[in-house]
Amino acid sequence: MTKFLPIRKTHPILKIINGSLIDLPSPSNISMWWNFGSLLALCLMIQILTGLFLTMYYTANIELAFFSVNYICRNVNYGWLIRTIHANGASFFFICIYLHIGRGIYYESFNLKYTWFIGVIILFMLMATAFMGYVLPWGQMSFWGATVITNLLSAIPYLGTMLVNWIWGGFAVDNATLTRFYTFHFLLPFIILMLTMIHLLFLHQTGSNNPLGLNSNMDKIPFHPYFTYKDLIGFLILMMLLLMLTLSNPYLLGDPDNFIPANPLVTPIHIQPEWYFLFAYAILRSIPNKLGGVIALVMSILILIILPLTFLKKIQGLQFYPINQFMFWIFVMMVILLTWIGARPVEAPYIITGQLLTILYFLYFILNPLISIYWDKLLFNK
């Protein structure tokens, strides 16, 4: 019987691809919000490929790193393009992953627990990779960003100082630090690639969620051609936006201080990370205690893990809970405002604003399940 089947269904390797991309049973009603998974895969591919070409010319040495990046931009064929695509590609990666997580929170896809937990691990890995990548050009913001962020580990009782010196490979951010950051920046995307495959493996065990939050087993359609073409439109839009930014204003999202070679003797006026970390940075700064700030920083991402545990509703998805919907969009606004606060100097109106926003950010995760219980009582009169 098998000899009458197409090769994609019988070949050991093609069978895996077929089950993931061609004959995968998909809910017929998934919207544009389900496109971001494939867009993230595209971003990862772009980053790995551009990174591979950059690494051929980059030199991980504090004397040469800044000038090797300069050399790439000035003398390597299309080096400026590869570098700016890589830098802006990271921004698009984070835009896509934040929208992907937002979709997961809104439609409560976190009930696919293993998929969600692996996703949170991928987010941590991505943040670590992006942070280490930011250090590599060895400009002022690279150096001071590395110094400030790694220094946060010194807040850990007993082990802190020893841990920081161990990561630095000395008593300050130096050549050893740059070399190891470069090593891990090269290695982590491949670990992210492996985790993505595990993420998909768990997702395909259960099947995707859908905008109604209902069991869609009775109404599935094959992934190809329906969603391959739908994803292709997303690819075209993403590539268009990425190239528009890269070719018209490539350094818009960067920091002007990073055009100055790293100087340990001169501190920039305002040390800040890239825009995609600013909300977490604002949360870190709003706690007046060092250890407390570090815990708040980690918890701002790690809190996503508690979402499946606080699911106490009778219906899946916020689309049936108007008050929760309203709260969700307030929460989105909080994250945007925290991003803005993170870029502002530490002075009068911004400090208290950041602290209030931090309280409201964490309050969402407490109030959301409580309000959903209240709404269930109204709906079901129990």
From Swiss-Prot:
Binds 2 heme b groups non-covalently. A ubiquinone binds at residue 204. PROSITE patterns: CYTB_CTER (PS51003), CYTB_NTER (PS51002). The chain crosses the membrane at residues 36-56, 80-101, 116-136, 181-201, 229-249, 291-311, 323-343, 350-370. Its cofactor is heme b. It is a multi-pass membrane protein. GO terms for cellular component: mitochondrial inner membrane; respiratory chain complex III. InterPro entries: Cyt_b/b6_C, Cyt_b/b6_C_sf, Cyt_b/b6_N, Cytb/b6-like_sf, Cytochrome_b, Cytochrome_b_C_euk/bac, Cytochrome_b_N_euk/bac, Di-haem_cyt_TM. One of its GO terms (molecular function) is ubiquinol-cytochrome-c reductase activity. GO terms for biological process: mitochondrial electron transport, ubiquinol to cytochrome c. It is found in: Mitochondrion inner membrane. SUPFAM superfamilies: a domain/subunit of cytochrome bc1 complex (Ubiquinol-cytochrome c reductase), Transmembrane di-heme cytochromes. Heme b b566 binds at residues 100, 199. Keywords: Electron transport, Heme, Iron, Membrane, Metal-binding, Mitochondrion, Mitochondrion inner membrane, Respiratory chain, Transmembrane, Transmembrane helix, Transport, Ubiquinone. Heme b b562 binds at residues 86, 185. PANTHER family: CYTOCHROME B (PTHR19271:SF16). The main subunits of complex b-c1 are: cytochrome b, cytochrome c1 and the Rieske protein. Belongs to the cytochrome b family. Heme 1 (or BL or b562) is low-potential and absorbs at about 562 nm, and heme 2 (or BH or b566) is high-potential and absorbs at about 566 nm. Component of the ubiquinol-cytochrome c reductase complex (complex III or cytochrome b-c1 complex) that is part of the mitochondrial respiratory chain. The b-c1 complex mediates electron transfer from ubiquinol to cytochrome c. Contributes to the generation of a proton gradient across the mitochondrial membrane that is then used for ATP synthesis. This is Cytochrome b.
